[in-house]
Regions:
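Glycan-recognition surfaces
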Residues: 23-131
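A glycine-rich phosphate-binding loop feature that marks nucleotide/adenosyl-phosphate handling sites
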Residues: 47-56, 134-138, 161-168
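Hydrophobic, well-ordered secondary-structure elements that form the walls
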Residues: 1, 45, 118, 184, ...
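Catalytic cores of secreted or luminal carbohydrate-active enzymes
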Residues: 112-162
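Active-site-proximal loop/turn and secondary-structure-junction residues that shape catalytic pockets
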Residues: 2-8, 49-53
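Aromatic- and acidic-residue-enriched carbohydrate-binding clefts of CAZyme catalytic domains
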Residues: 4-30
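Carbohydrate-binding surface patches
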Residues: 165-207
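C-terminal beta-sandwich/jelly-roll accessory domains of carbohydrate-active enzymes
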Residues: 190-249
C-alpha cells in the first residue's frame, strides 16, 4: 500500500526504453511477490484498492484479498462493495466495521447496520478501538462475529443475488452452493414519511425445501420466498437494516 503515484522515472534506462519503465516495474513487483508468497505460504497478503491502487487480476494471483476502499462508511460501502463484487469474488473483498462518526464523511450509523453491510461485503472484520466501546457494543460485536462464523462459507463461496436497489434501499441475498442456507440483507438509507411497504423476493433457493429463519421465528418454503417474498419492516429511522438467515430443515 503506497499512497502516491510513480512520478520520477529513473534515469537508468536508455531513452528508447523509457516507455518500458512501468511494465518493468510490474515485472519486478511480481517477482518480489512470488518470492514472498513462496517463502511464506501460510501468510495471507492483502493488496489495497485505495492507497496502493492495486486491485486487479494480476495482483490477485499473489494477494487473493484486497482492501476495497479506505472509505468504511456503511452507506458509502453499499455502492463500493456492489461495484467490486461485479468483478471480484466476495472472498477477495476486504470489508470491515469501523468507528463512528465515520472518519471520512462524519456519518453516524448503527453498529448493526455497519455489521450487516460488512458481512455482505465478503472478508469480514473490524478496525476500531475496542477500549472505547461500551459493554453493550462489545456484546453486539461478539454476536456479529458468531453470526458471521455461521454464514461465512455461504458469503464467501456461495451465489450472490442482487435483489432490489433504489436511491434509498438496497437488498441482496447469498445462497450456499448446496442451497442449504440463504443470507438476506436489506438496508434502508433514509426514513421517508408515509412510505409504502416494501416487498422483496429472494432468489436462488431450493423451491421445494423448507427453510427456518430464527430472526423471524418462522418457516418458509423456497418457492414461497422466491415468488411471494417478504415485507420489509416499517421502521421509521435512518440507516435501518435487517439480516435474515434461512437454514434448510
Amino acid at each position: 500500500d503506497m499512497n502516491r503515484n510513480i512520478t520520477n522515472i529513473p534515469e537508468g534506462l536508455a531513452n528508447d526504453q523509457r516507455f518500458e519503465f512501468h511494465h518493468r516495474y510490474m515485472l519486478g513487483l511480481y517477482r518480489v511477490l512470488a518470492h514472498l508468497t513462496k517463502r511464506f505460504p501460510d501468510i495471507l497478503f492483502e493488496s489495497c484498492a485505495g492507497g496502493g491502487g492495486r486491485n486487479d487480476l494480476g495482483i490477485m494471483y499473489y494477494m487473493p484479498q484486497a482492501w476495497a476502499s479506505d472509505d468504511t462508511d456503511a452507506i458509502e460501502r453499499l455502492s463500493i462493495q456492489e461495484g467490486t463484487s461485479l468483478i471480484y469474488p466476495p472472498s477477495s473483498i476486504g470489508a470491515h466495521v469501523s468507528a463512528v462518526p465515520n472518519h471520512q464523511v462524519g456519518r453516524i450509523t448503527p453498529l448493526a447496520t455497519r455489521g450487516n453491510v460488512a458481512m455482505m461485503g465478503g472478508a469480514f472484520g473490524y478496525e476500531l478501538d475496542l477500549t472505547k466501546l461500551s459493554e453493550k457494543e462489545l456484546d453486539e460485536i461478539s454476536q456479529q462475529i458468531e453470526t458471521y462464523h455461521s454464514i461465512r462459507e455461504t458469503i464467501q463461496f456461495g451465489q450472490l443475488y442482487r435483489l432490489k436497489k433504489t436511491t434509498n434501499t438496497w437488498a441482496a441475498n447469498y445462497v450456499s452452493q448446496d442451497k442449504n442456507q440463504a443470507v438476506f440483507t436489506f438496508i434502508k438509507i433514509l426514513a421517508k414519511p408515509e412510505a409504502p411497504l416494501l416487498h422483496v423476493r429472494l432468489k436462488g433457493l431450493d423451491p421445494d425445501a423448507l427453510y427456518e429463519c430464527p430472526q423471524l421465528g418462522e418457516t418458509f418454503y423456497g418457492d414461497e420466498l422466491m415468488n411471494i417474498g417478504l415485507i420489509m419492516p416499517h421502521v421509521q429511522k435512518d440507516y435501518f437494516s435487517v439480516q435474515y438467515i434461512f437454514n434448510k430443515i
